[in-house]
Swiss-Prot record:
Example GO BP: translation
Database matches in InterPro entries: Ribosomal_bL28, Ribosomal_bL28/bL31-like_sf, Ribosomal_bL28_bact-type, Ribosomal_bL28_sf
Identification of the protein by name: Large ribosomal subunit protein bL28
Alphabetically ordered keywords of this record: Ribonucleoprotein, Ribosomal protein
Key word Transferase present: no
PANTHER family linked: 39S RIBOSOMAL PROTEIN L28, MITOCHONDRIAL, LARGE RIBOSOMAL SUBUNIT PROTEIN BL28M
Length: 92
């Protein structure tokens, strides 16, 4: 499976490493030398989590991001799925 949150759709992003070294010119240095940028990936913090659904009387396994897991613990799984326009039947 893809490295993607099944609820929020968060996935790996791409960007640059920007090394900032040296003292700024305003502070009397030679500058910060932001010349060499290298590509990098920002990976999602994914967790395989088992949730119990009392209406169905069974558990489901969902690959969810840590950020979504915090939100689920605050408002509950049903409310969070409703907010993100998802249905429990999609995960069975």
């Amino acid at each position: 499976m893809a490295r993607k949150c099944e609820i929020t759709g968060k996935k790996t992003m791409f960007g640059n490493n920007v090394p900032r070294k040296g003292l700024a010119k305003k502070k009397g240095g030679a500058g910060q030398h932001i010349g060499v940028k290298t590509k990098r990936t920002f990976k999602v913090n994914l967790i395989n989590k088992k949730f119990f659904i009392p209406e169905l009387g069974r558990s489901i396994n969902i690959k969810v991001s840590a950020n979504a897991l915090r939100s689920i613990s605050k408002v509950g799984l049903d409310a969070f799925l409703k907010k993100n326009c998802k249905k429990i039947e999609n995960f069975l």
